[in-house]
Amino acid sequence: MALPSQEVSRTRNFCIIAHIDHGKSTLADRLLEVTHTLDRTQMSSAQVLDDMDLEKERGITIKSHAVQMKFKAEDGQEYILNLIDTPGHVDFSYEVSRSLAACEGALLIVDATQGVEAQTIANLYLAIEAGLEIIPVMNKIDLPSSDVEGVASQIIDLIGVERDEILQVSAKAGTGIDKLMDAIIARIPSPKDNKHLPLRALIFDSVFDPYRGAVVYLRIVDGVLNKGDRVRFFANDHIYTADEIGTMSLKRQPKETLASGNVGYLICSIKDVKDAKVGDTVTHADTPASEPLSGYKDVKPMVYSGLYPVNSNEFEDLRESLEKLSLNDASLVYTPETSVALGFGFRCGFLGLLHMEIIQERLEREYGVNIITTVPNVEYRVILTNSDVIEVDNPSKMPDTTKINHVEEPYVSMQIITLSEYIGNIMKLGMERRGEYKNTDYLDSSRVIMHFEFPLGEIVFDFHDKLKSISKGYASMDYEYIGYRESDLVKLDVLLNGEPVDALSIIVHRSKAYEWGRKLCQKLKGIIPKQMYEVAIQAAIGSRVISRETISAMRKNVLAKCYGGDISRKRKLLEKQKEGKKRMKQVGRVEVPQEAFLAILNIDE
């Protein structure tokens, strides 16, 4: 049984877009409360939609969530409101774009104390591209530091709305929520009623249930989906039976039918979330739609890093933990690898730096695995002299320099929003990181948007931390991938007594190789403990050593018992000691402590 058309006209699908910490999840809580989806007593925790501890702690939403609310409006009609919560961070921008595609409208939340930030703008542009109706909302108006008029003029400049169209709320105190509910119903259009067309549903998220397999969250765009239907996924052509379908209040509510305009879930015995790709289209297996919904793409990892257990006998635990994590995170890619220095581990691919930090933190916190992380790096494209192209995500896979024609690296276009007084500092940081400055736009008299193009490899490190510290926390950034460009890159090896330590190798720009090599050798000299023999730490490009530090040997004073006497006696003892040290050096292996691998991560400190 399909939904009657009037129910489609009383449906509103919307999402909330905001920068980190601008109060998005708190506002979602107030909406749940005002629609009686939850009452205050059930709100044992603030931010109901942020399930993971990490989401609450970092104040970010990592996964997209969906929740259905019912609201009786002033006209006496009951409306169905589907709120699709989107991740706000730059690493998850593809997930955001798919969540937006499942909506007709968006609430643009701007913190009245902070103003418009970089990720607000990035996600706003995605919403405008998706053709959504935007309702600007100013949050935290009750705080003494809020600048309501200043922020309102920024919003007006940004999206060209009238001043009275900007709603003012305090999500924490619950001020202005009623007006917001009226605006959602009045200003966001209802979905198109396309029940008569062949089924097409957009997947915007999936979660793993240990008993039911992957639970797919989808928005029905065209047609009707009934329980028991045979469905086909466009991306991989797999066919399943819809065992259970329904809508999401805070718990799953099974239904017999989902029709055009609805947001709900589908359970069909999918073993792996990787088979339910975000952005894919679901259609009927027997009467399929002729083409999928537009916008699907396979998300590729941008940042790679090696994860190794501190204790080599925890390798299996690490494997199991990664398997469990990847059940819920289709964008995590990992393959086993071995390192001479670190033993067995995994090479993992992440969407970006925040994604990498979250995975590492979850491994340590939820699964109790202690890990060593190698330097994060990006995927380089190496064009060989015989015109073959290979992709290198690990410095140890870099071919010999004689075989390389040239190397290309990924570039990103970046927007940085900051106060105008920090422009000089940010320009300096941009130049240090091989950035290409494009232009600056003024948001208002004191805030600017600066546009740069950067090699991704230069910002995966500590760029965000540096940006925050030179702007006293005022700058925010957002970037998007723009393609590969040719660069003069070299592989820098670290040798201990002539033996390369593969886990310390990195790929750097030739102009920075000497400085990096010198700093690294100095840092390692302070970390590697003294041995019974002399240890040479060298940084080399190919066979050419560009920097060297020496750790002197621990030695016993063999002359302590010689009082006076012949010089040749003393020389004989010294020669004997020297000979022994030489023999030790031939058979001895320098143990590299764990801190040495972390030293690269904070080489400037």
UniProtKB/Swiss-Prot annotation:
Name of this chain's protein: Elongation factor 4
Keywords: Cell inner membrane, Cell membrane, GTP-binding, Hydrolase, Membrane, Nucleotide-binding, Protein biosynthesis
NCBIfam families noted in UniProt: lepA, small_GTP
Domain tr-type G per the UniProt entry, residue ranges: 9-192
Enzyme class: hydrolase
Function: Required for accurate and efficient protein synthesis under certain stress conditions. May act as a fidelity factor of the translation reaction, by catalyzing a one-codon backward translocation of tRNAs on improperly translocated ribosomes. Back-translocation proceeds from a post-translocation (POST) complex to a pre-translocation (PRE) complex, thus giving elongation factor G a second chance to translocate the tRNAs correctly. Binds to ribosomes in a GTP-dependent manner.
Record membrane topology: Peripheral membrane protein
Lineage: Bacteria, Pseudomonadati, Chlorobiota, Chlorobiia, Chlorobiales
Organism: Chlorobium limicola (strain DSM 245 / NBRC 103803 / 6330)
Molecular function via GO: GTP binding; GTPase activity; ribosome binding; translation elongation factor activity
EC number: 3.6.5.n1
GO CC terms in record: plasma membrane
Subcellular localization(s) per the UniProt record: Cell inner membrane
Entry-linked InterPro entries: EF-4, EFG_III/V, EFG_V-like, EFTu-like_2, LepA_C_sf, LepA_CTD, LepA_IV, P-loop_NTPase
Positions contributing to GTP binding: 21-26, 139-142
Family classification: Belongs to the TRAFAC class translation factor GTPase superfamily. Classic translation factor GTPase family. LepA subfamily.
Short name of one Pfam family: GTP_EFTU
KW Protease (keyword) present: no
Catalytic activity: GTP + H2O = GDP + phosphate + H(+)
CDD domains assigned: EF4_II, EF4_III, LepA, lepA_C
GO terms, biological process: positive regulation of translation
